[in-house]
């Protein structure tokens, strides 16, 4: 017996020694609306930036922007789409934020990015300094915090 692969996954299992087929409904394909993704991502980023007390230059560096005009346009009216680079940067910022909220209580989480850090990765510098260096710095800080949480970085 054949089942349509368009609507269902087919799974074969044994029941009392014989094969038994059953259908599992396939989830409907989803697409992310680039405009909704941009709005949600930047709205969340700007809230985190306010909580971390980042100035415009720091926010621009984290977003990978060189144009102040673009930055302030984004703050005033969110763009209709974001580049893959910007989405990756946002993902790392959100991961860092989540880890800090898990590891540290309240205001300590927000202040962590500004405080000098004795861990070898930071060499006595604040994590923010490494984060401002680009995607690689964001990745390293996120991986460090994921390790501190005891989780794997994925």
Language-model-detected regions and their locations in the chain:
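Non-transmembrane "mature" sequence context
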Residues: 1-154
């Amino acid at each position: 017996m054949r089942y349509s692969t368009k609507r269902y996954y087919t799974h074969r299992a044994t029941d009392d020694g014989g094969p038994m087929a059953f259908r599992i409904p396939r989830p409907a394909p989803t697409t992310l609306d680039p405009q909704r993704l941009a709005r949600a991502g930047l709205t969340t980023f700007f809230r985190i930036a306010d909580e971390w007390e980042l100035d415009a230059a720091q926010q621009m560096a984290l977003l990978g922007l060189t144009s102040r005009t673009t930055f302030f346009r984004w703050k005033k009216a969110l763009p209709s789409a974001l580049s893959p680079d910007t989405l990756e940067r946002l993902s790392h910022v959100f991961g860092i934020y989540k880890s800090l909220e898990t590891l540290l209580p309240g205001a300590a989480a927000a202040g962590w990015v500004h405080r000098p850090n004795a861990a070898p990765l930071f060499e006595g510098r604040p994590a923010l300094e490494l984060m401002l260096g680009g995607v690689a710095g964001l990745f390293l800080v996120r991986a460090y915090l994921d390790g501190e949480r005891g989780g794997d970085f994925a």
